[in-house]
Each structure stands twice: as structure tokens, then as C-alpha cells.
């Protein structure tokens, strides 16, 4: 008599991983992908690139940002190859000389996206294939303070509606069109406003990095209901810097403390008034700003764009990247 095959509990079966559009990698797995890419930055250079309150060091650059610079170098090369194929297809009409490779960097206030953008600029400019790398922040496309006040938007500064989104999209579109020279407004964190009569000039870089809270936001429909082209439609690659909301809040408050002891001391600083009250009063203001402006903007507008990124960097409580998710091709 043949004995019946015992049933195997469902939990004992090997579970097939759920299919996702991303390849998920641990820090060690990602770090191994740098291959033999040399580290072109010194500790002093990293220190200068690091944002206030950020803890990026040479190990973080070596483990996280070197592999990313290698990946981006491969993307740029592949794009050049595709451009050559397109020129071959177009024949006599295929005289494209190439347009800048555009990278978007998004994430919350205080999450460290500005440091990520500066590191990428420094690392990518060391590759001989693309030495000219420009970095533009979306702060320059905030509406001037006078305009924000007139529209009742000062308490919404940083929300999508506080930007001149049409001008920002046009700026990147002109870069992508290959225009010889494109200009952008300049923002000053000291005066908390656009600097009058000052422009940033961008002249056909190999790579353009666009960094800001809302760079991955989809375009709003026009008044006629038609879908518009959005800023992110011009990106060749995008990075979202992610972390737990509680950690970002703690980093934000720590950064505010340090700014109060340094930059806010400048007599020209918009925030100097917070150096003339007690630390607890100043921190109460910072907590209120987080609770009423930065956190709602993160939850409503910034975090929902995470799924649009090519690469998601997930930071732990110590500001170090722990996991990464890379979109499949």
C-alpha cells in the first residue's frame, strides 16, 4: 500500500517574491556595485559639500555615491549610444549634437537632498566623459516674497503653488532643447527671497542636476482640461531621498538649532529675530513651522512622488542610507 504524501504546510513552501517595478538592494549589495571606481574626493572636499546637520563621510560617499556615479555614467553613455542610433535612423535629418543629461533630486526639507545633489555634481564632474556638470535648485523659482504675500501664500512657501512652475519647466525644456545659454533666478536663504537683478547662467552642460522638494510633481491639467508637460518629463534619471517622518523632523529641529547659532546671527538674516529670543521660544516656532507647513507638504505633495523616481535612497535614523530601490528597465 502506498502511503499518502504528507501535506506540506503553506508556510513551508518557498514564497515567491512579489513582483515590483524596482530592484531592492541592501547597503552592502549596493556598495559592491561600485566595482573598482576610484574615490576622487578627499575628506576636506566632502566636508565642504556636506549640509548643516548631515553626517555624510568618506565611507558614505564610497559605499553609496560612488556606485551611483558609476550607474549614472553608464546611463549617460547609453543615452549617447541611443542618440547615435537615432541619428543613423534619421539620416540626413539626424544631426543631433546631443543635449544635456538631466537628473532630478527630490525629497523633504532637511532630508539631505541638497548634499546628495552637490555630491553627485562633484563626483560626476570627475568622469572624463562629462566634466561639465551644473546644479540648479528650484528655490530660484519660488515666487518673490512680495508676490507670495499678495497671494496670501507665505504660509504655503515650499508648496507647489508657491513656485513659478511654468518658468521652471520652461527653463529645463530650454536646457533640454540644447539652447546655448539659459538663465534662472537666484534665491538667497539669507534674505529668504529672490535676489533682484541677479541671474544664474547655464551654458550647455554635459549634465544638469535639478534639486528641489517638488521636482517629481506631475503637471497640473490646463484650464482647458488638457494634460501638460511637467518638469519631470524632461528628466533622464531621478533620485528620491527618503526617511521616516519622525527622523526628518528631528533633523529639521537640529538643523534649526545650528542655524540659530550660525547663519541666523548675520544682521542681514531674515531669521535673526529668532536669535533674540530664548532657545525654547525659537524651537517652538520651528516645531510650529514643521507641524503646519513642512510636514503637511511632505505628506500631501512630496512623499506621493516617491514612486516616480528612478532610484529611492532610504536613510536610517543616523542619516546613512540603509536600502535602495532602483527602477527596472
UniProtKB/Swiss-Prot annotation:
Binding site for ATP: 107-114
Domain of life, source organism: Bacteria
Residue ranges of the region described as Disordered: 1-21
GO cellular component term of the entry, any: cytoplasm
InterPro entries tied to this protein: P-loop_NTPase, PanK, PRK/URK
Enzyme Commission code(s) on record: 2.7.1.33
Enzyme class, first EC level, given as a word: transferase
Localisation: Cytoplasm
Pathway assignment: Cofactor biosynthesis; coenzyme A biosynthesis; CoA from (R)-pantothenate: step 1/5
Keywords tagged on the record: ATP-binding, Coenzyme A biosynthesis, Cytoplasm, Kinase, Nucleotide-binding, Transferase
One of the GO biological process terms: coenzyme A biosynthetic process
MF terms (GO), sorted A to Z: ATP binding; pantothenate kinase activity
Reaction(s) catalysed (UniProt annotation): (R)-pantothenate + ATP = (R)-4'-phosphopantothenate + ADP + H(+)
Family: Belongs to the prokaryotic pantothenate kinase family.
Name by which UniProt lists this protein: Pantothenate kinase
Amino acid at each position: 500500500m502506498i502511503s499518502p504524501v504528507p501535506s506540506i504546510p503553506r508556510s513551508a513552501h518557498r514564497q515567491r517574491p512579489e513582483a515590483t517595478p524596482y530592484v531592492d538592494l541592501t547597503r552592502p549589495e549596493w556598495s559592491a556595485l561600485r566595482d573598482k571606481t576610484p574615490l576622487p574626493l578627499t575628506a576636506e572636499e566632502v566636508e565642504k559639500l556636506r549640509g548643516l546637520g548631515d553626517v555624510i563621510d568618506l565611507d558614505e560617499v564610497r559605499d553609496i555615491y560612488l556606485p551611483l556615479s558609476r550607474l549614472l555614467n553608464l546611463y549617460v553613455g547609453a543615452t549617447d549610444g541611443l542618440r547615435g542610433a537615432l541619428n543613423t535612423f534619421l539620416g540626413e535629418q539626424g544631426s543631433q549634437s546631443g543635449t544635456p543629461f538631466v537628473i532630478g533630486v527630490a525629497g523633504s526639507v532637511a532630508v539631505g537632498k541638497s548634499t546628495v545633489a552637490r555630491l553627485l555634481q562633484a563626483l560626476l564632474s570627475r568622469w572624463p566623459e562629462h566634466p561639465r556638470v551644473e546644479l540648479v535648485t528650484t528655490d530660484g523659482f519660488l515666487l518673490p516674497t512680495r508676490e507670495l504675500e499678495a497671494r496670501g501664500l507665505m504660509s504655503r512657501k515650499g508648496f507647489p503653488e508657491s513656485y513659478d512652475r511654468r518658468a521652471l519647466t520652461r527653463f529645463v525644456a530650454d536646457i533640454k532643447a540644447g539652447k546655448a545659454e539659459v538663465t534662472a533666478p537666484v534665491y538667497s536663504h539669507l534674505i529668504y527671497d529672490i535676489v533682484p537683478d541677479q541671474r544664474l547662467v547655464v551654458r550647455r552642460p554635459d549634465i544638469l542636476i535639478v534639486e528641489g522638494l517638488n521636482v517629481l510633481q506631475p503637471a497640473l491639467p490646463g484650464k482647458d482640461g488638457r494634460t501638460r508637460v511637467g518638469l519631470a518629463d524632461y528628466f533622464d534619471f531621478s533620485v528620491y531621498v527618503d526617511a521616516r517622518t519622525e527622523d526628518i523632523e528631528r533633523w529639521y529641529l537640529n538643523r534649526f538649532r545650528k542655524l540659530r547659532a550660525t547663519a541666523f546671527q548675520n544682521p542681514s538674516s531674515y531669521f535673526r529675530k529668532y536669535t533674540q529670543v530664548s532657545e525654547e521660544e525659537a524651537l517652538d516656532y520651528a516645531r510650529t513651522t514643521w507641524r503646519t507647513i513642512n510636514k503637511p507638504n511632505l505628506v500631501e505633495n512630496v512623499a506621493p512622488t516617491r514612486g516616480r523616481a528612478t532610484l529611492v535612497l532610504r536613510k536610517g535614523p543616523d542619516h546613512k542610507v540603509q536600502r535602495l530601490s532602483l527602477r527596472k528597465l
